[in-house]
Amino acid sequence: MKTTAAFLFFIAILFVGCEKDDFTTGIVGIVEYGHADCMPSPEGPKIAYDKYNGVLYFINKRAFENIGNGNLQELKETSIKTIIRNGELAIKLPVDTFLVIIEEVYHNTVDNTLIIEQGVILERDFKFWRCTSF
């Protein structure tokens, strides 16, 4: 009887420990990072993208707009951040508007502004890139 109880307890622990962290409000997608020669050309820059590996920041848009001459690095450190591996993004986020940036490059554009709504898992991909020459 003790063996059966111990076995059932062990199975219950395995089952609980293997549950996914499901969420109902947040974002999933793919993050890519690239580089390009930005010398002027009629075709524009040719960007070579790879799956991103690194830190992705979700900066509160209002806090960013009110930073003035403040320190962007301090704002990043107090923001929501996640580690991206092989480009895979899946994170629970609070309802708000965010500026999404990576460590290597900063862009403040509509393309990386994110509006999170209650009960919605947004599916969105991000492509960040930097110039290797001008």
Language-model segments: residues:
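Sec-dependent signal peptide recognition
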Residues: K2-L8
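C-terminal motif of bacterial Sec signal peptides marking the signal peptidase cleavage site
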Residues: L14-G17
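Bacterial signal peptide processing site
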Residues: E19-D21
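A short, amphipathic beta-strand motif
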Residues: T25-G34
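Short, ordered, surface-exposed loop/turn motifs in non-cytosolic proteins
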Residues: H35-E74, V95
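Short, surface-exposed beta-strand/beta-hairpin micro-motifs centered on an aromatic residue
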Residues: S79, R85-L93
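Short Pro-Gly-centered beta-turn/loop motif in secreted/extracellular proteins
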Residues: A90-L99, V105-Y106
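Structured interaction patches on ligand/partner-binding surfaces of diverse proteins
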Residues: E104-F134
